[in-house]
Amino acid sequence: MNSGILQVFQRELICPICMNYFIDPVTIDCGHSFCRPCFYLNWQDMAVLAQCSKCKKTTRQRNLKTNICLKNMASIARKASLRQFLSSEEQICGTHRETKEMFCEVDKSLLCLLCSNSQEHRNHRHCPTEWAAEERREELLRKMQSLWRKMCENHRNLNMATNRIRCWKDYVSLRIEAIRAEYHKMVAFFHEEEQRHLERLQKEGEDIFQQLNESKARMEHSRELLRGMYEDLRQMCHKAVVELFQSFGDILQRYESLLLQVSEPVNPEFSAGPIIGLMDRLKGFRVYLTLQHARASSHIFLHGDLRSMKVGCDPQHDPNITDKSECFLQWGADFFISGKFYWEFNMGHSWNWAFGVCNNYWKEKRQNDMIDGEVGLFLLGCVKEDTHCSLFTTSPLVMQYVPRPTDTVGLFLDCEGRTVSFVDVDRSSLIYTIPNCSFSPPLWPIICCSHF
């Protein structure tokens, strides 16, 4: 091949960021290609759209696929470059004057074929140098993919911690006021119990606030460690073959050690402090509901994403839903227009449920649809996330940092007061009171639950 054409061909296999042959190349929607690690490291803020470093256009692509054709051609070019390096005078075997085409796994050295069969190396494991180099680069890429997922997870956790810290003091203040309001509704005034409860709540809030700040600092440190290791792995992929072989084991040990140091987020949770007399007061408004028995044919289920809540389920896209899963959404047979009412529902062993009331128009217009948003819904929801569960209320959507109810949840509806209160019956504690509800009577009890 003409040397000029060869140079042009080789130039097309060079990443414009690192100026080395592509490793795991990706092509973004503007048409330019980069090493995946280079593109990721150049993407400074994961919360915003990535920008092409060549044409400066933004790209909406996030799940980038490897350009297999470009990857194979870059591998061929790298192997050709390696063969040229191995045929240099410095790399020729001094004993046999042969090219060092074999790699010894035991002493991490390059050998010619005759040396690899010598008495010294005969019992060692050997493999072709070209294959060993590419195999190690592939292993480094696999580690980088795993590391990138960790970096994304840490980024999400850091954002979540930042949001919690920003809202925490307001959340604590609202919770204190809600607990104080419950004590003041009692016929008998439990002043000392109220003071102890509120003081404990204030102290817990301060302790958790400190834990959140400490956790954020640890995650910020983890972010720098993860990024540094990702950069080191990327650079190792481009090292000369001798250094790649000699340093490979050390960098993998550093990688494994780093994973043990990555900080996990704090899941803040107040203790479930009982309120004396709460259940006695609420049971004075007790009603017993009858649920409509038509189970939704679409296996309606609850998804809780605190950025875009959905009520409903799609068996095709939820790996937790199987043929044996029981998913349903039902309304009460009776509705409420005015007055005060209290009822309970036993959630059993379900970790995925929503329970509350809804405005009439929500029921009439959307009862057979997947529901996006929360207009007209006044719910307490529980969503399982790995081994942890999150509680939240709607209207507006608010995380609730209290223990998950173990069994029975109670709801107190005050139509004139425009409030919906949720209580943990077994612990005799208040979960949350939704204030200033935009009721549009009649109001219907609603329950959405799944059992796996």
From Swiss-Prot:
Q: Where is the B30.2/SPRY domain?
A: 269-452
Which residues are noted in the entry as Zn(2+)-binding?
Answer: C93, H96, C115, H121
Zinc fingers (B box-type) span which residues?
A: 88-129
Q: Which GO terms describe its cellular component?
A: cytoplasm
Q: Which top-level group of life is the source organism from?
A: Eukaryota
Gene3D superfamilies linked to this entry: 2.60.120.920, Classic Zinc Finger, Zinc/RING finger domain, C3HC4 (zinc finger)
GO terms classed as biological process: innate immune response; regulation of gene expression
Any Pfam family from its record, for instance, is: zf-C3HC4_4
Disulfide partners:
none
Keywords linked to the UniProt accession = Metal-binding, Zinc, Zinc-finger
- Output the Gene Ontology terms for molecular function: ubiquitin protein ligase activity; zinc ion binding
Task: Note whether Nucleotide-binding occurs among the keywords.
Answer: no
Q: Where are the zinc fingers (RING-type)?
A: 15-56
**Record's PROSITE patterns?**
B302_SPRY (PS50188), ZF_BBOX (PS50119), ZF_RING_2 (PS50089)
Family membership, please give it.
Answer: Belongs to the TRIM/RBCC family.
- What is the protein name given in its UniProt record? Tripartite motif-containing protein 51G
Species of the source:
Homo sapiens (Human)
